[in-house]
């Protein structure tokens, strides 16, 4: 896809959080590995890479299916809880940082009267904790979290719920920005007018180019230049 857009063609921009606007991605693999280890399951680096971009509960389910075939819902929830507890402890001692240019891009979009949505696979409790750490509690017009939709990425639910909350009914006037294949696949499923991949997170340029997209840029700080 290669349809160039101006900010004048858009009503809203939907941003992923980890790896796209915030640098917290390095904590997630560690917490996931430790959460599984508590139940005696050791994950490889390749297994952890394979679930990047998926909702955290869906990632847990997929990994358990590979290891034990048919996990119970109780085990899935137990390991997911382990993961979240580990992650919360890491948030207390590790720094969460803004991706360079993210704040400036948000200011630019607001000056153009565009709506901003943040999407994340995290549950709302943890998403709010992360945003508070970086002073972003009120940065977006809406925040849609993994526990507020039926399906996580690569399903389009997070984007569609963002549109619903902000009363944006035409997907062609929506841009979606993310750092994973799941982000771009979700954008395609939602039929957004502009699907943007960024190279500050989980997946490489070559990996992102395997998915439907309109644009791949180094980072969110480059978005205003493209939309001007």
Sequence positions of predicted segments:
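Asp-based, Mg2+/Mn2+-dependent phosphohydrolase catalytic module
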Residues: 1-10, 107, 123-124, 129-228
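Residue-level marker of regulatory loop/turn positions in helix-turn-helix DNA-binding domains and
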Residues: 98, 119, 151
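Conserved G/P- and acidic residue-centered "switch" motifs that form tight phosphate/ATP-binding loops
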Residues: 16, 20, 120, 179
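Short, flexible loop segments at the rims of nucleotide/cofactor-binding pockets, characterized by
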Residues: 92-97, 121, 193-195
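Hydrophobic beta-strand core positions in alpha/beta domains
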Residues: 117-118, 197
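Short phosphate-binding/catalytic loops that engage adenosine nucleotides
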Residues: 112-114, 213
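N-terminal helical cap/lid subdomain that shapes the substrate entry/recognition surface
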Residues: 3-103, 108, 112
